[in-house]
Amino acid sequence: MIGGLFIYNHKGEVLISRVYRDDIGRNAVDAFRVNVIHARQQVRSPVTNIARTSFFHVKRSNIWLAAVTKQNVNAAMVFEFLYKMCDVMAAYFGKISEENIKNNFVLIYELLDEILDFGYPQNSETGALKTFITQQGIKSQTKEEQSQITSQVTGQIGWRREGIKYRRNELFLDVLESVNLLMSPQGQVLSAHVSGRVVMKSYLSGMPECKFGMNDKIVIEKQGKGTADETSKRCLRQESCGKQSIAIDDCTFHQCVRLSKFDSERSISFIPPDGEFELMRYRTTKDIILPFRVIPLVREVGRTKLEVKVVIKSNFKPSLLAQKIEVRIPTPLNTSGVQVICMKGKAKYKASENAIVWKIKRMAGMKESQISAEIELLPTNDKKKWARPPISMNFEVPFAPSGLKVRYLKVFEPKLNYSDHDVIKWVRYIGRSGIYETRC
Amino acid sequence: MTDSKYFTTTKKGEIFELKAELNSDKKEKKKEAVKKVIASMTVGKDVSALFPDVVNCMQTDNLELKKLVYLYLMNYAKSQPDMAIMAVNTFVKDCEDPNPLIRALAVRTMGCIRVDKITEYLCEPLRKCLKDEDPYVRKTAAVCVAKLHDINAQLVEDQGFLDTLKDLISDSNPMVVANAVAALSEIAESHPSSNLLDLNPQSINKLLTALNECTEWGQIFILDCLANYMPKDDREAQSICERVTPRLSHANSAVVLSAVKVLMKFMEMLSKDLDYYGTLLKKLAPPLVTLLSAEPELQYVALRNINLIVQKRPEILKHEMKVFFVKYNDPIYVKLEKLDIMIRLASQANIAQVLAELKEYATEVDVDFVRKAVRAIGRCAIKVEQSAERCVSTLLDLIQTKVNYVVQEAIVVIKDIFRKYPNKYESVIATLCENLDSLDEPEARAAMIWIVGEYAERIDNADELLESFLEGFHDESTQVQLQLLTAIVKLFLKKPTETQELVQQVLSLATQDSDNPDLRDRGYIYWRLLSTDPVAAKEVVLAEKPLISEETDLIEPTLLDELICYIGTLASVYHKPPSAFVEGGRGVVHKSLPPRTASSESAESPETAPTGAPPGEQPDVIPAQGDLLGDLLNLDLGPPVSGPPLATSSVQMGAVDLLGGGLDSLMGDEPEGIGGTNFVAPPTAAVPANLGAPIGSGLSDLFDLTSGVGTLSGSYVAPKAVWLPAMKAKGLEISGTFTRQVGSISMDLQLTNKALQVMTDFAIQFNRNSFGLAPAAPLQVHAPLSPNQTVEISLPLSTVGSVMKMEPLNNLQVAVKNNIDVFYFSTLYPLHILFVEDGKMDRQMFLATWKDIPNENEAQFQIRDCPLNAEAASSKLQSSNIFTVAKRNVEGQDMLYQSLKLTNGIWVLAELRIQPGNPSCTDLELSLKCRAPEVSQHVYQAYETILKN
């Protein structure tokens, strides 16, 4: 199991050091600093073995978090734990920075004592932790409160406490997708996938039982096997929606979702944590709507000049508007000057980033825009050819490129007197660019 | 208020000030002071001097302050054990606190204080906490048992904590169950033999139920524990798999990987015809692909595991090539791993896409990545024959870029392509030769030289090219020197007239001016070959090379199976078994996949961690290789060879003898001149004993004893036992037995190649042993041993080797070498192979000797359950050279007086008492007398084996 946990600043100074196992000596702290943080080379692996001691590290801004062990631990678990720890710290004091860590070191030690016992990760849901790690000293808790805390921390529903009350029961669903693309210069899709998340913010009283439904192909087809009557009705409805069901390659769920039920019936049912959480993640690769197409044209004119022309085309309903569009066109390292002409938006050559950055605030669907640039090059005797990194793109569109649609989210709370109809529900779709690249 | 100010105080007299503050009356001030102490502790300052003052702050109702004091205690208690006792009272009191959070905190902290005296006080509170009404206290106490076990294992056992911990597996609270499972699994790892976890269908059922209810971490503990279980049949395996598959949709990647581990392992037991098997395979792919959208560090762990899974079951991910395409901003470690998997998945169906990608990667910035990409193109050419042509032209394009390391890497892989497809792509040689000057890495130089030598007849200026390399011969690395030597010899054999000088030059450089033994040996062999029999030389040097295999970098199958059992863990990240990086006995239990069963009804209860070796006879594998290695290096290789080898003829060691003799006769022949060249035999030559594979092969028939002799008559032959499991010898499995037939002893070996590559160049050597056993001939394996092939060999043994007394007496330590490595094992030989044919003593002599040997040398044994009469026993023993001298009948008992002689001349006298008339008593009594009483035990064993078979 995890033998110890260290947090360093960018200089390699220790901010937090907590050792759980006897086999980890004080020199382990220095070994990591010397061999990894101060190493001259770029980090070649997130797992490092130094003298039979293994170090796992992750970096958040310029803070290093390292877990150390001498055993054959579950490596995936260690990284998951480190990420979880970052989440917990962020939930308590915001951004993970040297200042925040120094300001909260007592709290961090208290948390580390609670969420990692002898190197075994324990309940690390912030919802539960915040009920008893408060930094307020000991509150005069009543006996009931105490046993409520312990049963929540150890219980089946460790992520939600009882007795939550809202005057207005409300929930927000965000379908956040990032669409990834790698396209060849000729316009051939080399790989494309959407990785999506359904984030839920729930402000619901009691212990509500929720059921979430979407246009998952497997579910729709299963239901389609019902009566012929129903089927025809559904067909009609789907046709009016335009897009039919979608094929989900794979999905994973927050720990509140009953996985065995999903496995047997493919229904998504759960008791949500209070506040914001990520209900599910999913991935699709079929029938993706690619919101933009990038058409590059690069011409080398002699040894000292490069002509670049890039056309972007938007490919969605004209009534919708894409926002925050940014096209990044890489330039060679020996660029001496750039002239840019674009019809829409603003374009600038950023020497520090070796790229031309072209920004457009808004763009409607089914439109086209282009930029052309002349790049002057300094003559070099560098033999190595310029690697021509791909042209990348950022944008945000108000629909889900995978085609996912929320069909329902039903809420049942048998003990309290509010029904599914009383809950106010909001659904929002946002499609963002992930790694959206076109080679040139 | 912020806490960061505590990090900044670094003035003198700080400790003194802190002391005062700690003893302050004001609560706030106290707390501030403790915070400062903790901050100093974190940055590595020694604040142990404040121990009593800090401990004084422990008695407080402020939970935050209490936790800080506890933190201090955990750090410094070990350095101040006496002072730490001061804290015990507070702990014991806290364990009784009405607040469960405080009870848990106390028991949690106490377990972290590694001071013996405190541990004693811990037992009672711990016992109470294990049965506490509050689940939070119980789950903390469960982990505390593991802590205590780490400090004092005996104490935990004596106090019966392990049983209480086992009971917690049936606890109503899932988190208590999970922590108990985690604690027990860790304790069980340090006691591999104990049956602590005692997994049976009932307990498995409990775990599977808890799996649905506990936290993500608890699910990991339970799944990792489940993976150690061995279902009794395929039905049970399937039902566990069905209940584990829902975990594949968990958001936590570690839960997913642990579930994959359980499924991969139990899948071994399912029949491939089963519908469920196919369904399971399909279910595994999507979650594995999803892991690649996790954070980069987890992607890395996932990719290392996918690498194993793809090797074990390629069918799972064969359609998922695209997801492994490298993204421009992937971290380098993710890029390199993805590349590895891409090559593994490359097939005819997707090769076009893969090649396009690889070509793209070859223009990236990171040198390592680019090299690997270029190498990958070569591997594709070798793996997918249809793509070879395109790969070669891609490589040529890359060479045109003139980027130094790209060119070098390309040449290295083109060499491999030439080996795979001989005489197909020679047209590119010209292009390669243009880049000769830019090669500065040994591997690339060696590859280029190999190409020039191999295709010398088609390269007009081959001699010039090679000569240019020869100028700096001594500055080259060994790899290049060896290659250059071979290439020039090849050139000479192809164009003898023009290159005599060159070859003389390289031979003398290699043999006289070099102090590298490998180079020298190779030089001598070539020299001698050329000087004695150029035709043979041509056959040897220009022999057709075996085609290189498609997959050269696969993990050896036995290791792969073991690593599959460790999916998700560090072992799977390092691709090494835990014993390679974990210290001490922890976690080095060898794991293996369950055997495939076809609905077997066997009622055997399998162990938690089954061992890979078959049960029953297993040779003692020598524990410490170091010692033996030293010993083997001191082996007497016969008398030291001095002077020219022509003189060495009467030597004991078969290998030397053969080589010497073989060369002797070869050299006697008239050298068939090539253009009348006269070679002078090298002046001094120390010929290595075991290198003569190609030379000795002509004589191999002589020693081919395997066929023919068989088991005509002769002493009892034990069935073959595995001496060297494939696990320990990189895929070579050796089993064998000893036989004695008409006066000659031999070792019957069965070599099985369980690796993926061809094995050649076998040789065998014994360490010195009690009876001077030594091979009488070299180990003759005619053809290279291809994967999954088995050969049977009979190795004649002599007893004239050097003698050293072994413990046990009949221990034989053996070294076997092949082209891969040298392996060591030891085995026990039955003593009766040493009983000689003329071991019959005459009666008078027997009597006299019996009296002469002192009584204390007599040893008595019983051979149980052996219902034989005197005649039967006598004839059985006689066939193994134990001779009956006389027979008497005393009071209804048959007495046999017997004698035998060992190869080293030791006589053993025996008296065997048989009670034929008494069916209830089938035991035989054996008395042995011998001047060397230490052999008696082994002679008795020989008796027993012979009589019972």
Swiss-Prot record, chain B:
Expression across tissues: Widely expressed.
Main location: Golgi
Compositional bias (Low complexity): 594-611
Modified residues (3'-nitrotyrosine): Y574
UniProt-listed GO biological process terms: basolateral protein secretion; determination of left/right symmetry; heart development; intracellular protein transport; kidney development; melanosome assembly; platelet dense granule organization; vesicle-mediated transport
N6-acetyllysine found at: K318
InterPro entries found in the cross-reference section: AP_beta (IPR026739), AP_complex_bsu_1_2_4 (IPR016342), ARM-like (IPR011989), ARM-type_fold (IPR016024), Armadillo (IPR000225), B-adaptin_app_sub_C (IPR015151), Clathrin/coatomer_adapt-like_N (IPR002553), Clathrin_a/b/g-adaptin_app_Ig (IPR008152)
The keyword Protein transport appears for this protein: yes
A GO CC term attached to the entry: cytoplasmic vesicle membrane
Topology versus the membrane: Peripheral membrane protein
Record-linked Pfam families: Adaptin_N, Alpha_adaptinC2, B2-adapt-app_C
Keywords linked to the UniProt accession: Acetylation, Cytoplasmic vesicle, Deafness, Disease variant, Golgi apparatus, Ichthyosis, Membrane, Nitration, Protein transport, Transport
Localization in the cell: Golgi apparatus; Cytoplasmic vesicle, Clathrin-coated vesicle membrane
Region described as Disordered: spans on this chain: 584-625
GO MF term set: clathrin binding; protein kinase binding
Disease named in the record: Keratitis-ichthyosis-deafness syndrome, autosomal recessive: An autosomal recessive form of keratitis-ichthyosis-deafness syndrome, a disease characterized by the association of hyperkeratotic skin lesions with vascularizing keratitis and profound sensorineural hearing loss. KIDAR patients manifest ichthyosis, failure to thrive and developmental delay in childhood, thrombocytopenia, photophobia, and progressive hearing loss. Low plasma copper and ceruloplasmin levels have been reported in some patients.
Job description of the protein: Subunit of clathrin-associated adaptor protein complex 1 that plays a role in protein sorting in the late-Golgi/trans-Golgi network (TGN) and/or endosomes. The AP complexes mediate both the recruitment of clathrin to membranes and the recognition of sorting signals within the cytosolic tails of transmembrane cargo molecules.
Family: Belongs to the adaptor complexes large subunit family.
Subunit structure: Adaptor protein complex 1 (AP-1) is a heterotetramer composed of two large adaptins (gamma-type subunit AP1G1 and beta-type subunit AP1B1), a medium adaptin (mu-type subunit AP1M1 or AP1M2) and a small adaptin (sigma-type subunit AP1S1 or AP1S2 or AP1S3).
Protein name: AP-1 complex subunit beta-1
Gene expressing this chain: AP1B1
